[in-house]
Amino acid sequence: MARDPKHDILFEPIQIGPKTLRNRFYQVPHCIGAGSDKPGFQSAHRSVKAEGGWAALNTEYCSINPESDDTHRLSARIWDEGDVRNLKAMTDEVHKYGALAGVELWYGGAHAPNMESRATPRGPSQYASEFETLSYCKEMDLSDIAQVQQFYVDAAKRSRDAGFDIVYVYGAHSYLPLQFLNPYYNKRTDKYGGSLENRARFWLETLEKVKHAVGSDCAIATRFGVDTVYGPGQIEAEVDGQKFVEMADSLVDMWDITIGDIAEWGEDAGPSRFYQQGHTIPWVKLVKQVSKKPVLGVGRYTDPEKMIEIVTKGYADIIGCARPSIADPFLPQKVEQGRYDDIRVCIGCNVCISRWEIGGPPMICTQNATAGEEYRRGWHPEKFRQTKNKDSVLIVGAGPSGSEAARVLMESGYTVHLTDTAEKIGGHLNQVAALPGLGEWSYHRDYRETQITKLLKKNKESQLALGQKPMTADDVLQYGADKVIIATGARWNTDGTNCLTHDPIPGADASLPDQLTPEQVMDGKKKIGKRVVILNADTYFMAPSLAEKLATAGHEVTIVSGVHLANYMHFTLEYPNMMRRLHELHVEELGDHFCSRIEPGRMEIYNIWGDGSKRTYRGPGVSPRDANTSHRWIEFDSLVLVTGRHSECTLWNELKARESEWAENDIKGIYLIGDAEAPRLIADATFTGHRVAREIEEANPQIAIPYKRETIAWGTPHMPGGNFKIEYKV
């Protein structure tokens, strides 16, 4: 199928200095948890996107010196020849597919905690990081400035040696160049502080030095936070931003534009809960107005129509993407081939980002279960090993895990029967996507629905059976399938069982008229009173989402939370605006409080720290702490129990108890996946469905086969002349 001619503009080549982008699709620098220490992961993840048609692939932020060490998080590094060797694996693989490779040179100032190197970071002035804990920098004198600028030059030369085509001076997200430019950080009174011209001096000099060193071989880019979105007192696009672009335009070959700062970089990597694609256009277009160089901006671009609007209206020249490239590494190729309904659209949940925020474990993706698994498991997002046997597979449950398993199995040539009691695939995601701001999460369901519909046309023996009665163990055993996958999901606890006490709460019972589970709130069938209390022991989105839904509908909402409310939303960058939203709606929170018992219309709550700080051994059967005297009663008209989830695995348990009957019914194996195995993130539920489907022919698909680990082996020196002998300097 040919692409629509109006999209031809997206495939025009773009010249950036001495290099040429083959089209306008550009993967901006983004973290994956590979850095320089996992070259297989780094090269495989970036190169599969090069295969998918992206014009350029960048590393994550890449440290130029041990003074810029982001441990506990995992960045790339280009400190020495060992890093050059490891990163060259990426550039070599990317070049095989005709794409350019870029590196983002990073010096963090006080935002680099240096937990591994224990070096002292330097900055324009001495300040404490608002992002890191107990991290201060040394104010740079003139010799410090010259030395750090040389760090950039040396790193740029190593980058060229590693095969990189594009070299960034990273000045977004409150890192060193922007710290000099921003009066929020820069309190200097010498030639590097005060006026805009002085505050810009460090950045301009650094660009000039890097360009002189490698500019004939590499395109020079800078990532610029054109507006910190705090208003006066920091960087504003039409006050300082545009003027700086005019100052630096001759020194760069391409502008990569962001907004926001390090403390709230979710203003740039906007979650779909709060921001639609293209949300940064009002700022990016201001740069395009004054620059003579190619300009790119990000905005979770997934729709080709939005992409051509950006180019034809002159907002930007290049479509910058991070999250959309993770969700679908073959997005450019699918647009080029006119396969628009095959695009795996990023849902904007920011679970990919959460892994970096947590500290750098391998990146995952809710939409694309192969993300991060390209090297270690050998998974390709568009290629599947074709089965040589004729096994049929019954999948009970068409939620995120079951529908993903069905898709992968059908792609691999199996006959699949996917069944569910609901009228639509998606499982609990159908309710979740109806919560405020989460509509785009339904793209997860839509992609699988579209692909399964297509695959059913190819394999006439496969079936999708929705709106069915619940299957019993007898139904499964007598169905006639060779293999069975149970994907019956999870539900919220009706009795208040929670992570704090691991027991039900006396009086908790969602069958009562004044108590509800989240599912009951979302399905809207049960009457909800004016005064609502949400009892929370969940650390993700459910309690604040229900609070927003109910408060918007006119209810008076109080959240009683025994855990840090919405803690995981810190990692997905949703937390600041979620808290602002609850404040706007006058939602009250009683943090560090939980419930001891419930009676009609009221609940007894207590401060979880109310048992005192002193501990004394008092013998068996007696608490070593004092009695908690903080108990008090609060009233409600309706109580929502957001205390925990449990797997709906009754069918699995019944089948497992009758395992001796499997063989006599010609069943080779029955497997449990997704939330039915254990409640988890949608991304992880999707992954388990994908994994079991990929490994369905293994001896026991329930247990994952070992993946390739990238480790430093004893006796393999990382640096030239290095060794792994234990030697003490005495």
Curated annotation (Swiss-Prot):
Its cofactor is FMN; [4Fe-4S] cluster. Pfam families: NAD_binding_8, Oxidored_FMN, OYE-like_second_a-b. ADP binds at residues 401, 420-421, 428, 471, 675. It comes from the Bacteria. The keyword Oxidoreductase applies. The keyword Iron applies. [4Fe-4S] cluster binds at residues 346, 349, 352, 365. Its EC number is 1.5.8.2. The active site is at 175 (proton donor). InterPro entries: Aldolase_TIM, FAD/NAD-bd_sf, NADH:flavin_oxidoreductase, OxRdtase_FMN_N, TMADH/DMDH/HD_second_a-b, TMADH/DMDH_FMN-bd. GO terms for molecular function: 4 iron, 4 sulfur cluster binding; FMN binding; metal ion binding; trimethylamine dehydrogenase activity. Substrate binds at residues 170-173. Keywords: 4Fe-4S, Flavoprotein, FMN, Iron, Iron-sulfur, Metal-binding, Oxidoreductase. The modification S-6-FMN cysteine is found at residue 31. One of its GO terms (biological process) is catabolic process. Binds 1 FMN covalently per subunit. FMN binds at residues 29, 31, 61, 104, 223, 268, 300, 322-323. It catalyses: trimethylamine + oxidized [electron-transfer flavoprotein] + H2O + H(+) = dimethylamine + reduced [electron-transfer flavoprotein] + formaldehyde. SUPFAM superfamilies: FAD/NAD(P)-binding domain (SSF51905), FMN-linked oxidoreductases (SSF51395), Nucleotide-binding domain (SSF51971). In the N-terminal section; belongs to the NADH:flavin oxidoreductase/NADH oxidase family. Homodimer. Forms a ternary complex with the heterodimeric electron transfer flavoprotein. This is Trimethylamine dehydrogenase. It comes from Methylophilus methylotrophus. The lineage of its organism: Bacteria, Pseudomonadati, Pseudomonadota, Betaproteobacteria, Nitrosomonadales.
